[in-house]
Design a protein with these regions (language model features):
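Loop/turn-rich, solvent-exposed surfaces of beta-rich toroidal or solenoidal domains
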Residues: 82-129
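Beta-propeller blade signature
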Residues: 1, 47-50, 114-135, 171-173
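Surface-exposed loop and turn segments in beta-propeller and other repeat-based domains
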Residues: 1-21, 51-84, 142-144
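Structural signature of eukaryotic scaffold interfaces centered on beta-propeller domains
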Residues: 18-41, 84-95, 148-151
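Short glycine/acidic-enriched loop and turn motifs that connect beta-strands
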Residues: 41-44, 106-110, 162-165
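Blade-level signature of beta-propeller repeat domains, shared across WD40, Kelch, NHL, RCC1
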Residues: 149-174
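Residue position within the beta-strands of beta-propeller blades
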Residues: 37, 101-102, 157-159
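Short consensus segments that form the blades of beta-propeller domains
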Residues: 16-17, 35-38, 113-119
């Protein structure tokens, strides 16, 4: 069992664990040798090595956006996103070579904005990382993306909010 959360909150293990528990996304490398977690509150990418003999060990923690959160009233250990929370990873999938992510970056207040229904704050980019945590590429789609999956490294499928939840076929490295 792995219980060593990266120190991202500055407030200790319980808050770090809460940040990683709140709507985080997870992807596993095809050979099961690595696992990645991306936080929704802030954008923290945590990549771990999985070894049957050595157990689980950290590979890279990449702090893209600082995890700013709001405490839930009457529940001291619970947190949620707030107006100043950078929204991080909304979706994640993996191949043997790359992590394909929807990394947003908008602030929580934009999710509650009056025009959010007509102009929703979803990302239009697929952000691609290698399994060592290096940013490899961003593919701009021109569509507001809500979910994605990949088929190897040549094709991603994504759900676009813009066109009544249409399914897009995207070639991320073209």
């Amino acid at each position: 069992v792995y219980k060593t959360y990266p120190n991202i909150s500055g407030e200790g293990t319980e808050k770090d664990a809460a940040i990683f528990r709140y709507a985080s996304k997870m992807a596993i490398k095809g050979d099961y040798s690595r696992i990645a977690f991306g936080t929704y509150i802030g954008g923290v990418l945590d990549i771990l090595q999985i070894d049957d003999t050595l157990g689980i060990s950290p590979v890279k923690t990449l702090g893209i956006y600082k995890p700013v959160y709001t405490k839930v009233k009457n529940s001291p250990d619970a947190i949620t996103w707030g107006d100043e929370t950078p929204i991080g990873f909304e979706a994640m999938d993996a191949s043997d070579r790359y992590l394909y992510t929807l990394l947003n970056g908008t602030l929580g207040k934009n999710l509650k904005a009056k025009d959010a229904i007509n102009n929703p704050p979803f990302t239009e980019k697929i952000s691609i990382f290698d399994w060592n945590g290096h940013a490899v590429k961003q593919t701009y789609t021109g569509k507001k993306l809500m979910g994605l999956t990949n088929k190897g490294d040549s094709i991603c499928y994504a759900v676009a909010y813009d066109d009544n939840y249409s399914l897009l076929k995207i070639e991320p490295f073209k």
